[in-house]
């Protein structure tokens, strides 16, 4: 089976696509996956680093661009559809999965017109504009939150969760080693780390009596690292401060409480590794979807949510203290998070995709082609 994964822009779209691709290629040596995205998106660097080929099209978003910006970006669509058609003709995928982001629109629509089975994977509680539009033509809509189902026809919805990359999953499932002092993990994700960094430093004076009894790992991003380190030192704390955490699975395994944003991929990781959390949704997220994402964990008893407009150092310190000082509450929150986890999401989504392929092509392996056959890239593909 050959799968094409279209879309990207941010890690929240790209990483679930990579997780699905990893599941597909490990199932059978003849399976392969190709991605389609844009040169400006995170996928342009992350996908090749993960070992998958990627094709690039030229397309820009319409939402939030203003009238003139939207009209200018609309002019790119005919070219994007032509590029998508060329890519689909060359790669001959058996199924195309859109993972959100504006790059997925032309590819999935062109695949639908070519009678190739199509699906979308929606990571958030509120479906993005592109996925909402594509939902009218695709065969399946894979969702992670019950709230997202309302954007798609009921017969198309498969609520299976967000896929998590295989290497991370293997580490999450390792038994934890025993430890003593409570451990706190803080990170802001790819967007919106600054405000969270500032409020954590403001919280430290209110946690001064815990500085000898708490271990902190804090991912700051490049902009704030020096300021955050100085803030910790001024209050007598000795944390592990990093610009970027390379191995998030180890960071999760080594903590008792997480303070973070409420992106869909982050929440999928928190639930699979069963970690209590204090969630501060990114207020600029499209359609305020991070608040809706966070609410699903809060309602289940797995997390506490503080909206950024209400976030102060004192409020954050109080929530951290209340949870770290209550081992039984942490355990209840951990169990609640685990009940929301979807460790089999990638496998189950791949199962449905293979069934779509079987229905269309008469075999779960798709169209007849030479084993391992991949098209050569023409020099004018992006032109």
Curated annotation (Swiss-Prot):
Quote a single Gene Ontology cellular component term. plasma membrane
Top-level lineage group: Bacteria
Among the GO biological process terms of this entry, one is: carbohydrate metabolic process
GO MF term list: UDP-N-acetyl-D-glucosamine:N-acetylmuramoyl-L-alanyl-D-glutamyl-meso-2,6-diaminopimelyl-D-alanyl-D-alanine-diphosphoundecaprenol 4-beta-N-acetylglucosaminlytransferase activity; undecaprenyldiphospho-muramoylpentapeptide beta-N-acetylglucosaminyltransferase activity
Q: What is its main location?
A: membrane
Region span, Disordered? 364-383
Q: What class of enzyme is it?
A: transferase
Tell me the membrane topology, using the record's own terms: Peripheral membrane protein
What Enzyme Commission number(s) does the record list for this chain?
2.4.1.227
UniProt keyword terms in alphabetical order = Cell cycle, Cell division, Cell inner membrane, Cell membrane, Cell shape, Cell wall biogenesis/degradation, Glycosyltransferase, Membrane, Peptidoglycan synthesis, Transferase
Q: What pathway, per the record?
A: Cell wall biogenesis; peptidoglycan biosynthesis
List locations, semicolon-separated: Cell inner membrane
Q: Which reaction does it catalyse?
A: di-trans,octa-cis-undecaprenyl diphospho-N-acetyl-alpha-D-muramoyl-L-alanyl-D-glutamyl-meso-2,6-diaminopimeloyl-D-alanyl-D-alanine + UDP-N-acetyl-alpha-D-glucosamine = di-trans,octa-cis-undecaprenyl diphospho-[N-acetyl-alpha-D-glucosaminyl-(1->4)]-N-acetyl-alpha-D-muramoyl-L-alanyl-D-glutamyl-meso-2,6-diaminopimeloyl-D-alanyl-D-alanine + UDP + H(+)
Indicate which residues the UniProt annotation says bind UDP-N-acetyl-alpha-D-glucosamine: 10-12, 124, 165, 190, 245, 290
Enumerate the HAMAP family for this protein: MurG
Q: Which family does it belong to?
A: Belongs to the glycosyltransferase 28 family. MurG subfamily.
Q: What does this protein do?
A: Cell wall formation. Catalyzes the transfer of a GlcNAc subunit on undecaprenyl-pyrophosphoryl-MurNAc-pentapeptide (lipid intermediate I) to form undecaprenyl-pyrophosphoryl-MurNAc-(pentapeptide)GlcNAc (lipid intermediate II).
Q: Which PANTHER family match?
A: GLYCOSYLTRANSFERASE (PTHR21015:SF22), UDP-N-ACETYLGLUCOSAMINE--N-ACETYLMURAMYL-(PENTAPEPTIDE) PYROPHOSPHORYL-UNDECAPRENOL N-ACETYLGLUCOSAMINE TRANSFERASE 1 (PTHR21015)
What is this protein's record name?
Answer: UDP-N-acetylglucosamine--N-acetylmuramyl-(pentapeptide) pyrophosphoryl-undecaprenol N-acetylglucosamine transferase
Taxonomic lineage is: Bacteria, Pseudomonadati, Myxococcota, Myxococcia, Myxococcales
């Amino acid at each position: 089976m050959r799968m094409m994964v279209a879309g990207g822009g941010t890690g929240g779209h790209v990483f679930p696509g990579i997780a699905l691709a990893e599941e597909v290629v490990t199932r059978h040596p003849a399976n392969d996956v190709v991605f389609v995205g844009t040169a400006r998106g995170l996928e342009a660097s992350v996908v090749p680093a993960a070992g998958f080929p990627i094709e690039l099209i030229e397309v820009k978003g319409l939402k939030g661009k203003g009238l003139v910006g939207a009209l200018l970006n609309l002019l790119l669509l005919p070219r994007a559809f032509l590029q998508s058609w060329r890519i689909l003709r060359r790669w001959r995928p058996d199924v195309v999965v859109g993972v959100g982001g504006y790059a997925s629109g032309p590819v999935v629509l062109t695949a639908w017109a070519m009678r190739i089975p199509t699906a979308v994977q929606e990571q958030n509680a509120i479906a993005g504009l592109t996925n909402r539009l594509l939902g009218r033509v695709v065969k399946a809509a894979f969702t992670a939150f019950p709230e997202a189902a309302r954007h798609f026809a009921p017969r198309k919805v498969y609520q299976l969760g967000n896929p998590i990359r295989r290497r991370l999953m293997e580490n999450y499932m390792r038994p934890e080693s025993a430890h003593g002092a409570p451990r706190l993990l803080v990170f802001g994700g790819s967007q919106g780390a600054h405000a969270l960094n500032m409020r954590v430093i403001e919280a430290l004076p209110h946690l001064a009596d815990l500085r000898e009894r708490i271990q902190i790992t804090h991912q700051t991003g490049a902009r704030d690292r020096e300021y955050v380190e100085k803030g910790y030192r001024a209050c007598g704390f000795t944390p592990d401060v990093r610009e970027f955490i390379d191995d998030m699975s180890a960071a999760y395994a080594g903590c008792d409480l997480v303070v973070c944003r409420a992106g869909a991929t982050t929440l999928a990781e928190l639930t699979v590794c069963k970690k209590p959390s204090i969630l501060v949704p990114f207020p600029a997220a499209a359609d305020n979807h991070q608040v809706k994402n966070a609410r699903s964990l809060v309602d289940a008893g797995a997390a506490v949510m503080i909206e950024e407009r209400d976030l102060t150092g004192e409020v954050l310190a109080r929530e951290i203290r209340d949870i770290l000082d209550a081992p039984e509450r942490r355990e209840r929150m951990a169990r609640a998070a685990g009940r929301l986890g979807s460790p089999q999401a990638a496998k189950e989504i791949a199962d449905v995709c293979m069934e779509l392929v079987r229905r269309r092509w008469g075999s779960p392996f798709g169209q007849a082609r030479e084993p391992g056959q991949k098209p050569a890239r023409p020099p004018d593909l992006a032109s």
